[in-house]
Amino acid sequence: MMNMKTAFVTGATGLLGNNLVRELIAKGCRVKALVRSLEKGRRQFGSVEGVELIAGDMTDVAAFASHLQGCDVLFHTAAYFRDNYKGGSHWPELKAINVDGTERLLEQAYRAGIRRFVHTSSIAVLNGEPGMPIDETCLRRSEDADDYYRSKILADEVVLAFLQSHPDMNGSLVLPGWMWGPADLGPTSSSQLANDVMNGKLPGLVPGSFSVVDARDVALAMILAAERGKRAERYLAAGRHMTMQQLVPLLGKIAGVQTPKRTLPLPLLYIIAALQEAYARLSGKPILLSLATVRLMVKEANRSHFNHAKSERELGLTFRPVEQTIGDTVAWLRNNAAES
């Protein structure tokens, strides 16, 4: 087992990042947590001991690089992902943060003496035939990718190129699915969906399938990858294949609310998405359905069966029941709503 006395975590207030910080603290590790907002960092980690908040942004890695000194391992979870979430095109931000920011972070970590890192990749870098199991070897071509997917593919290429040119640096890549779980201050699309279901705002079911995973299980996968992962290897942490027709009724049952039964036709989904994007532009608020999301659902339908044999064999990774994940997500959202 490697020495992990002090870890540096980017994206620390995010759904994955904050759960990773908590898991590291529970294992006796000190954590330097990169946050864009100290206020949000204090809100997320107010009562957690062993966390040092570092204010910084992935668009200016040099500004926080001195804090990488003295760390044993780097966990990179920060990413810009709103291309599929807020609507519109965000390629400059996607490239600046997900691609260029990753490269600069690795360069600064190496200069600071860090020789072990775990990079958060995505199932977006993989592709396969509908209904067939997809593993870490099923790589997606960048020309078969939207802007967000392309940014994750290019980020992986940056990571692997860095490892090739720095033979004394060790790094692994973890590929999460659609993450759910508690402490989602964002909120990300999973908590947005849960809130919409609980508040009766979901007009109907959408077609398509997803791979649902607990952010806490992904956090454990990151730690296991740091401890046991092989150099320059990808490890899936995608979770369980589910259709929206399975997920929403389960969410309703656990939350104790009625859920829609009908599946919305695709032409209507495109109209709703266009209207939501217009609303997002006017209000600046996140939306559940963007045009990019609808296109993605159509393109990726039934391409969410992932084979975790490698992660199970080499990392010892397991997943908690999806019912527990949804239950904990709902409970946290309700408690958080009551407090705010």
Residue locations for each model-derived region?
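NAD(P)H-binding glycine-rich loop region in Rossmannoid oxidoreductase-like domains
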Residues: 47-100, 108
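Glycine-rich "substrate-gating" loop/helix at the edge of Rossmann-like oxidoreductase active sites
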Residues: 145-146, 177-186, 203-216
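N-terminal Rossmann NAD(P)H-binding glycine-rich loop of SDR-like oxidoreductase domains
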Residues: 5-27
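Mid/C-terminal beta-alpha module of Rossmann-like enzyme folds, strongest
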Residues: 221-289, 308, 313-314, 323-340
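Substrate-positioning beta->alpha
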Residues: 104, 189, 206-227, 233
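Conserved Rossmann-fold NAD(P)-dependent oxidoreductase catalytic core, especially the SDR/UDP-sugar
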Residues: 96-148
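Glycine/proline-rich active-site loop of Rossmann-fold NAD(P)-dependent oxidoreductases
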Residues: 167-169, 181-192, 225-235, 257-259
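Active-site Tyr-X1-5-Lys
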Residues: 145-172
